[in-house]
Regions:
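Conserved catalytic cores of phosphodiester-cleaving nucleases, focusing on short active-site segments
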Residues: 37, 56-80, 88, 94
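Short acidic/glycine-enriched loop/turn segments that link adjacent beta-strands
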Residues: 52-54, 124
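Hydrophobic "anchor" residues on beta-strands that sit immediately upstream
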Residues: 43, 66, 111
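Acidic-basic catalytic patches of nuclease active cores, encompassing PD-(D/E)XK
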Residues: 2-47
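Metal-dependent nuclease catalytic cores in nucleic-acid-processing enzymes
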Residues: 95-106
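Short, conserved glycine- and acidic-residue-centered signature motifs
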Residues: 26, 30, 86-91
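Domain-level recognition of nuclease-like catalytic cores that cleave nucleotide substrates
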Residues: 104-135
Length: 135
């Protein structure tokens, strides 16, 4: 799924982010992904859930499914797409973190899914691609 946003909309988002100190490109991407999922009426249950092993960007319910969402953001044009930045090592880490989250919160016998939201930004707009069940 691909969504394009026009210049005016991105300008307001970037203006808001500019008022916050130390905002990274990744924070911008996670904020856009969060707004996208809320617009689609997903129930967000955690953001930036951390352990010593790493971090899960977003965790949400999409109907009965517990979904672990990895958000990748890049400036366009770039040599590598955001999708290609999720290698086997990162996939293994996401899986370990997901099971750790489920164990800690006693969430057993739930259908789970791993989604990827890839965002490419430019000076005027951004492109969001949502890959459901990417691993």
């Amino acid at each position: 799924m691909e969504v394009r946003i026009r210049k005016g909309r991105v300008s307001r988002v970037r203006a808001w982010l500019a008022t916050r100190k130390g905002v990274r490109l990744g924070d911008f991407g996670e904020w856009i992904a969060l707004k996208y999922l809320l617009f689609r009426r997903w129930d967000i249950i955690a953001r930036n859930w951390r352990t010593r092993q790493g971090e899960l960007d977003l965790i949400a319910y999409d109907g009965p499914d517990l979904v672990f969402i990895e958000v990748r953001t890049r400036h366009a044009p770039t040599q590598f797409s955001p999708e290609k930045s999720v290698d086997g090592k990162k996939r293994d880490q996401l899986e370990r973190l997901a099971y750790s989250f489920m164990e800690r919160h006693e969430l057993y016998d739930l259908p789970i899914r791993f989604d990827l939201i890839a965002i490419e930004t430019s000076a005027r707009d951004y492109c969001l691609r949502h890959y459901s069940g990417f691993m």
